[in-house]
C-alpha cells in the first residue's frame, strides 16, 4: 500500500513551522521533536495492524492550498454545508464535531492561503477491529513516548477524544449488536444486548426494537452508547423507568493500558466495572464492547406543548416557569416519567414528555395541576397529545429516524444538575429560576434545554455515577451555536459569556450539586474533581493507578488528568 499520507503528516508540525522544542523528558513527543517516530517505525506499526493505520489528512484540506496539495474549490464549497452536520464526522477517523476543539487550524471557512495545520488533530489513527489492534497501539505509544487517545464517533463537547501529536484508537467500526434473549449472571437474568464500542443510538434503537425491546441511549442519534455516553453516566428519555444508562450495564469488554484483554462485571474485575460505569471515558481502559440490559418494549404516551414569551406577559411567563419547577417532583414521582423542555427568547416548548406505557391523554391528566396554574396566569398554551406504539417510533417522531435526525455540528454547551431539594424551598427555587432567566435575557440567542428525571429511588448496582444525579430533579444545558460567519474574536466573546458569567451564575445558584461530565464546554472552568466526580474521585484515582500506572490514557478533566498539562505547542507534559 502507499504510505504517501504518512510522509505528508510527518512534516506538518516541524520546528520550521514554529513548534517550540521539547523542554522536558516528561513530555509526550509531537511531530518535530527528535524523539518523534520515524517513517519506518510508523510503517512497521501499519504492518502490525494489517494496514489499518491512517495518517491524518483533515477533510478541510480540500479548502487549503498547503501543505497537502488537495485543494479543490468544488469539494470545499460542498464541505462548507456538510461541515454543519454531525453525520459528516462519523466515518472519519480524526475529525471531531466540536468547532472549539477544531480551533480554526484547518476548517472550510478560512482563507485557502492559510495552511491546513493539524492543530488539535491526532496525527495517526488505528482503525480498531479487535483487541490486538488496541494492544499494538498501546505498545507503540509506550515505546515511542507519544500521546494516546480513544475516539469513537467524535461526538465530543469537551475535546477529550483528540490531541496534538496523538495516536488515536478509533473504535467506530466495532459496530455489531447482539441480542441476548436470556443473559444469566449471579446478579441478573433477562434480556440484554452486547454492543460494540462503535454502535450509535440511531442504529441500536432499530435493532433492539425489531427484537421487541427498548434500550437507554442518547437523544442525539450519533452518540456512541458503549463509549463516553454510558461511562459518563448516560441520561436518556427512559431514565425514569430504568435509572442512568450506567445502571443497566452488565459487563464491559476492555483492553487495559497494560495490554490485558479483560471482562469487567459485578463478579469479575469488579473495581474496574465500578469505575467504567459512570466514572468517565478515555482514562481507565479501551472499551471494545458493552453488554447492557434491554427492556420489554411498549407504548409511550407523550405530548407537545408550547406557549410564548412576549413583552406583555414577561412576569407571568416566568411565574409559570417557576410553577413548573415546583411541579416537577410531583410529575417525575408519578411514574417512570421524564420531561425534556426548552426555554428560548421566544417561549417555552415541551418537546419530549416521556411517559412509558401510557397515552397522550393520560399524560395531559398528569400535567393538569401545572396547566391549571398557567391558565390562572392568563397564558395561552397549546398541547397536542401523541401516542406511540413503541419506543423507536416515539424517539423517531421527536428526533428523526436512524441517524437522519442528527443535529448540527455547531452546538456549544455546558450543563448543570439542578438539585431536587431546592424545589421545596421557595427562596432557592427563585434563585435558580432567576439564573435560568439570565441565560435567556443576557445570553445572545442562547437556548436552555432541561431534562427532568428522578433516578434516586431506582435500584441499581454499585457504580461510579456522580452521586448528585441521585439527588437531582433535572440536568440543564445552556446551548448556543458556533457561527462561522462572524470573526474568531466575536465567537470567542460568546464563549467567554458562557463560561465566565452564565455558567458560574448557575453554579452559584445550585451549591453542592454537580455537572454532567459528558456535557461541559472545553473551556469550562469549574472545580472539575468536585463537580464531575464528587466523593467518588479518590476511589476512581486508585483504580486508575492500578490499571494504568503510567497514566498512558489521558483526557481533559478525566480521572488522573490533574497530573498533566499541555504546553504552548500542545505537548502533553507531566506536572
Curated annotation (Swiss-Prot):
InterPro entries according to UniProt: BBE (IPR012951), FAD-bd_PCMH (IPR016166), FAD-bd_PCMH-like_sf (IPR036318), FAD-bd_PCMH_sub2 (IPR016169), FAD-linked_Oxidoreductases_BP (IPR050432), Oxid_FAD_bind_N (IPR006094)
Pathway: Secondary metabolite biosynthesis
Top-rank taxon: Eukaryota
Glycosylation sites: 46, 103, 127, 175, 268, 308, 359, 425, 485
Expression induction: Expression is induced in complex medium (Czapek yeast autolysate medium) supporting calbistrin production. Expression is positively regulated by the calbistrin biosynthesis cluster-specific transcription factor calC.
EC number, UniProt record: 1.1.3.-, 5.5.1.-
GO terms for MF: FAD binding; isomerase activity; oxidoreductase activity
S-S pairs: none
Name used for this protein in its record: Bifunctional decalin synthase calF
Species whose genome carries this gene: Penicillium decumbens
Source lineage: Eukaryota, Fungi, Dikarya, Ascomycota, Pezizomycotina
Gene name for this UniProt entry: calF
Amino acid at each position: 500500500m502507499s504510505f504517501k499520507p504518512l510522509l505528508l503528516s510527518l512534516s506538518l508540525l516541524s520546528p520550521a513551522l514554529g513548534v517550540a522544542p521539547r523542554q522536558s523528558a516528561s513530555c509526550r513527543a509531537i511531530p518535530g521533536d527528535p524523539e518523534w517516530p520515524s517513517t519506518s517505525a510508523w510503517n512497521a506499526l501499519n504492518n502490525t495492524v494489517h494496514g489499518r493505520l491512517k495518517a491524518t489528512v483533515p477533510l478541510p484540506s480540500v479548502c487549503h492550498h498547503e501543505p497537502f496539495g488537495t485543494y479543490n474549490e468544488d469539494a470545499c464549497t460542498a464541505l462548507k454545508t456538510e461541515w454543519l452536520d454531525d453525520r459528516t464526522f462519523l466515518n472519519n477517523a480524526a475529525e471531531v464535531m466540536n468547532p472549539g476543539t477544531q480551533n480554526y487550524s484547518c476548517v472550510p471557512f478560512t482563507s485557502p492561503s492559510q495552511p491546513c495545520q493539524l492543530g488539535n488533530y491526532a496525527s495517526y489513527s488505528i482503525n480498531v477491529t479487535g483487541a490486538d489492534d488496541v494492544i499494538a497501539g498501546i505498545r507503540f505509544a509506550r515505546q515511542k513516548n507519544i500521546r494516546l487517545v480513544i475516539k469513537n464517533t467524535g461526538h465530543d463537547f469537551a475535546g477529550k477524544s483528540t490531541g496534538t501529536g496523538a495516536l488515536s484508537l478509533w473504535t467506530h467500526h466495532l459496530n455489531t449488536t447482539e441480542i441476548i434473549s436470556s443473559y444469566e449472571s449471579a446478579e441478573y437474568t433477562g434480556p440484554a444486548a452486547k454492543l460494540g464500542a462503535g454502535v450509535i443510538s440511531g442504529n441500536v434503537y432499530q435493532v433492539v426494537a425489531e427484537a421487541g425491546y427498548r434500550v437507554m441511549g442518547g437523544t442525539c442519534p450519533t452518540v456512541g452508547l458503549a463509549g463516553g455516553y454510558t461511562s459518563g453516566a448516560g441520561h436518556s428519555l427512559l431514565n425514569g423507568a430504568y435509572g442512568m444508562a450506567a445502571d443497566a450495564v452488565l459487563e464491559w469488554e476492555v483492553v487495559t493500558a497494560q495490554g490485558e484483554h479483560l471482562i469487567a462485571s459485578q463478579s469479575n474485575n469488579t473495581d474496574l466495572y465500578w469505575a467504567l460505569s459512570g466514572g468517565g471515558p478515555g482514562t481507565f481502559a479501551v472499551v471494545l464492547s458493552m453488554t447492557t440490559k434491554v427492556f420489554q418494549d411498549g407504548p409511550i404516551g407523550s405530548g407537545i406543548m408550547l406557549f410564548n414569551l412576549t413583552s406583555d406577559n414577561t412576569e407571568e411567563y416566568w411565574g409559570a416557569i417557576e410553577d413548573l419547577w415546583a411541579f416537577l417532583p410531583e410529575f417525575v414521582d408519578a411514574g417512570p416519567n421524564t420531561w425534556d423542555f426548552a426555554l428560548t427568547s421566544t417561549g417555552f416548548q415541551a418537546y419530549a414528555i416521556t411517559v412509558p406505557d401510557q397515552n397522550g391523554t393520560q399524560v395531559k391528566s398528569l400535567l393538569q395541576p401545572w396547566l391549571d396554574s398557567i391558565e390562572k396566569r392568563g397564558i395561552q398554551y397549546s398541547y397536542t397529545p401523541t401516542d406511540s406504539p413503541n419506543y423507536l417510533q416515539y424517539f423517531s417522531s421527536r428526533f428523526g429516524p436512524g441517524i437522519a435526525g442528527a443535529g448540527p455540528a455547531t452546538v456549544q454547551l455546558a450543563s448543570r444538575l439542578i438539585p431536587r431539594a431546592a424545589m421545596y424551598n421557595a427562596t432557592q427555587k427563585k434563585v435558580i429560576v432567576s439564573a435560568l432567566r439570565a441565560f435567556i435575557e443576557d445570553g445572545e440567542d442562547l437556548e436552555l434545554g432541561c431534562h427532568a428525571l428522578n433516578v434516586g429511588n431506582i435500584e441499581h448496582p454499585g457504580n461510579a455515577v456522580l452521586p448528585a444525579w441521585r439527588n437531582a430533579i433535572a440536568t440543564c444545558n445552556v446551548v448556543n451555536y458556533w457561527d462561522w460567519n462572524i470573526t474568531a474574536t466575536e465567537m470567542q466573546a460568546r464563549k467567554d459569556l458562557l463560561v465566565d458569567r452564565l455558567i458560574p451564575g448557575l453554579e452559584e445558584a445550585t451549591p453542592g450539586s454537580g455537572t454532567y461530565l459528558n456535557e461541559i464546554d472545553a473551556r469550562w472552568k469549574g472545580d472539575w474533581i468536585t463537580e464531575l466526580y464528587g466523593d467518588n474521585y479518590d476511589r476512581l484515582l486508585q483504580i486508575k493507578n492500578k490499571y494504568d500506572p503510567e497514566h498512558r490514557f489521558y483526557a481533559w478533566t478525566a480521572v488522573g488528568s490533574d497530573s498533566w498539562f499541555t504546553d504552548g505547542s500542545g505537548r502533553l507534559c507531566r506536572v
